[in-house]
A protein has these predicted regions:
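Ligand-binding clefts/hinges and TM-proximal coupling segments of bilobed small-molecule sensing domains
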Residues: 121-142, 177-178, 207-238
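Periplasmic-binding protein-like
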Residues: 10-11, 89-97, 167, 171-207, ...
Length: 238
């Protein structure tokens, strides 16, 4: 049986995934291990299609990958491009600043340059902050690392991303966690709209690994500091 192919970036964004040493063929972290559960459930090998962030959905639309499995918040702008499975994760969103920055609420960010990934749920949140300058990141091979470096260097004053990756960064001496917004952002696997059979296949496998507790085990292995969103996932909604 043919491999199942998921598109993603190759980046150091622990605990979601770490930078691969072989171009993305071998990956570690919550995202790759959760995807492996689905591949195993389907009896197929798993193949990663590594592309820049803004090429992940086009890769699926072209047929180069079967789905986008890479931090895809289920938001309207993406739902216009692909169909989504049930959620396999639910996260809040946090704002990261440099160490010593006094910002602790959205209104404290007035006049700040705030980075977020183009077209993401994080950018939608950043757009609600009053009087900030939005700095979109999208096209590089490692967009997450680029945003972190932009905060570190002072190119931007803050960045918005999901709490699963920003909260650990806030523990590093050069950064502070400004605040977390309780957005309950659901993540799913995006599949081309003209491949409903692939969507059904992946969604069914996800339902089974959620129902029998296998996904929860992987969650607790990689993200023990975050409670598993059992009710949201087992209900198939956010």
């Amino acid at each position: 049986m043919a491999a199942i192919r998921f598109s993603c970036i190759d980046s150091a964004a622990a605990p979601l995934f770490d930078l691969s040493g072989d171009g993305g063929r071998t990956r570690t972290g919550f995202e790759p291990e959760a995807a492996q559960l689905v591949a195993d459930e389907l009896g197929r090998t798993l193949e990663w299609v590594i592309v820049p962030w803004d090429e992940m959905i086009p890769a699926v639309q072209r047929g180069d990958a079967d789905g986008v499995w890479c931090g895809q918040g289920i938001i309207p702008s993406r739902q216009e491009q692909v169909d989504f499975t049930r959620p396999y994760a639910v996260f809040n969103e946090s704002v990261l600043v440099r160490s010593g920055d006094p910002a602790r609420a959205p209104e404290d960010l007035r006049g700040y340059r705030v980075a977020a990934i183009t077209g993401s749920a994080n950018m939608r949140l950043a757009e609600t902050f009053p009087d900030v300058e939005l700095v979109p990141f999208a096209s590089s091979d490692d967009v997450f690392a680029d945003m972190i470096e932009a905060v570190r260097s002072g190119t931007v004053d803050a960045m918005v991303d999901d709490d699963v990756v920003t909260v650990p960064l806030g523990d590093q001496p050069e950064f502070d966690l400004a605040f977390t917004a309780e957005t309950r952002n659901p993540w799913g696997v995006g599949v081309a709209k003209d491949r409903p059979e692939v969507l059904e296949e992946i969604d069914g496998a996800l339902a089974r690994v959620i129902a029998d507790g296998r996904l929860e085990e992987v969650w607790k292995k990689w993200m023990p500091h975050l409670p598993f969103p059992a009710e949201a996932l087992r209900g198939g909604t956010s």
